[in-house]
C-alpha cells in the first residue's frame, strides 16, 4: 500500500522537475530500495483448497494498473528492485533473506564493512531489530527523500532498557510475551525513544521470539525495539541459508566493533529501565480495540462482558439489568418480515439465527466471525505456527471442528511456512479445520479480511451485534479488521485455532470445553495444548535451511500472473492515464515555483474535526473497504466503477481523488462536533449544516477558509500511513492541535506542510473550554518560527468571547522548519534538485 503511492510521488516529481527545467532522470534512488508487494491480496475465498489460487487471480484482476506502474518503475529506476506479490510480507522477507546485518563494499580498492541500517515505509520495519539491525518505519514521503539522497534527520533519542530474566513457562508463547511487554512499555511511556532489550533472559529466546518483540515496537510506541547480535543471530542466519562467509563476517565484525552480546556482557547504561521475569508471562490476548489492552486468558470471558456495553453501536442497547439478554433498539421494530427469512431473531435477546450454507447458525454478542492466522509478527515464528498445527492435529483426532460461521484464514508471511508445515505433516490438520493458505501477504492484519457471508453480515448489521475477530496480528484498532466487527483480539496462532473451535470469546477456556469428542466427552484446551517438547522437536525435524535457499533463489521471478504483465517501454516519464481510478498524477507539485513563500499566520480558521484520545492513522485514513454511500464510493460510481470492483482504500492510494474523500472517513471515528457520532461527518460552520468531512472541506475551501483539527493524546498512533498526512493537507487543513503526537505521523504532517501544534502541559481542549465551534487565529508563525517555539492561539466563540492560549510548535529541528516552509519534504528536495544543490 505504501509502495505504490511512493512510486506515484517519484513519477510526479520527475514531471515536476522537468517543468522546473531540470533533468527528470535525476529523480532516482541513490540508496538501494526494495519494494515487496504484500498489502493487496484479500481474503475473498477461504476454507477450501483452491482459495489461494482464486485470491491471487482476484488480486491481479483488481490491481493490474497498480502492478503495471511498478513494472514501469522496475525499468525506469536504478537501485530499485521489486519482490512480486505472492512471495511474502516485507518484514519477514527482510528477516529471512534481505537483511545482511553487516554490509561490505569496496571503496577505492579497500574492503569496507559496516552495520546494516534501513528505513521502511511500514511501521513494523522494526521487526529486523530482532536480528541486530537498526531500522524503523517512516512515512512514505520521508522514505522517498532518503532514496533520493536526503539525510534522515531526528533528535537524539533517549534509550530505555528492557531487562528480561528467566524462561517462558509452559503454555506461554512469544505472542503472550509481546502483549505483556506492549502493555508494560505503553504504561511506561516510550514514544520517540529507543528500547533496547538486555539481560540473561535473551539467551532463552529464539531469534524469531526476538523478532516478534521487535516487530511490535510501534504498538508500544518506541522508535525501535533493539536486540544486539548474539549466538542466536548467527544460528538464525545459518538456519535461513545465509552463506557461511556472511555469517563469519557478521560474527567477526560485530565482535570487533563491540556489538556482540554474551551472557558476560555488562549491562549498558540507559535513560531508564524496566524488568520482566519471563517466568511470570501467561497466556493472553489484547483487545477489543487497542494492542496495549492485554487480557489474561483466564479473564477473557469476564472482560468481554465488562467491555460489551461500550461496544454496542449507537441506536442499539443492552437490556437494563442484564449483560446480554434481550435484543432491543431505540426507535426500531424487531419484527422479521416475510421477505427476511434468512435472518430470524431468536428467543434469547442478543442472539439472531442466520442461514449459512443451508443451516441455521446462532450469531450473538461475542460470536467469533473471523479467526485468522495472519501477520509477520507471528507467522515468522515457527514455534507458534507449529504450535497451532499441533493443536489442530489433536483437535481433529478428538473429533472437533471449527464452528461453521467462523471465517478462517491462514496467510503466512513467507512461503517457507507452508513448506515446514507440509514437511511436518501438520498442514492437512489445519486444512481439516478450514485453515487453508489463502495468500502470502498482510491480508486480515491490514484489514483485507474480505466480506463476511451475506446473511451473517445482515444479522450483525441489522441487529447491532458486537461480534469478534481473533487474529495473530499486531493491530486491532476500530474498524481496521472489518467494519462490522467491533471486538477484535490479538492472540497467538495457537489461540486463534482454539477460538475458531469454540466460535465465541465469552468462554472460560480454562474450565469450559472447546467441544465434545465422538463419545460425548468434553475436550478442554489443556487436553490438546502442545507441550514445549513437541513444538521444539517438530521445528527441529521439519525446518531446513534448504527451504529458504530454494524459495528465495527465485524471489524476483513472480508467478505466471506477474510474468504475464506487459513490460512497458523504458521511459523516464510515466504515461498517466486520464481515466484511471487507481493511478493519477497527484497535485502536490502543480504550479510550484522555485522561490519559497514566507510562512504565514493562520487566520479565521474553522475546526473540521474535534477528536478524542488515541486517534489512529486508521481513523484518519482507512485501509479497508470503501463504503458505497460515502464520498469515495460516490466518486468511484461516478467514474463507472461498480461496487463489487471498489477494492480497498489501501489499493486506491495511487489516486488522490479517492484518498482525500476517504480522509477522516473511518466508520468508527467519532467527531465530537457531532457529539461523538460515529462516521466521517462534521458540522459546517457557521451554517450548522451536517455534511461529510469531504463535502464540508470543499465548501470551506470555496470560501477560502483555512481549517484545523483539534485532538487529544497519541494523535496519529498506528501505521506509518503517509496518506493520513496527505489527505489532511488536501482537505485544506493547515494545522493540527493535539495533546501529543505519535512520532511517525508528526513527521508526516511536517513532510506535507501541515503545522503540528501541541497543547502545553496541563492544557487540554476541555480545560480550555474549547467547543470546536470557535474561529481560530494562530499567530507567531510568520515572525518567530523556529524549532521548539511557541505560537499564540485566539479562539473566538459565537458570542464574541475569546480564549487565548499558547501552543508548542512541534517543528523539532531546523530541517523541520525548512520542510514546513517549503510546503513539504518532497517540495524541498525538488527545489534543491532544480537549483542543482542536490
Task: Report residues per predicted region.
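Fe-S-dependent hydro-lyases/dehydratases of central metabolism
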Residues: 1-838
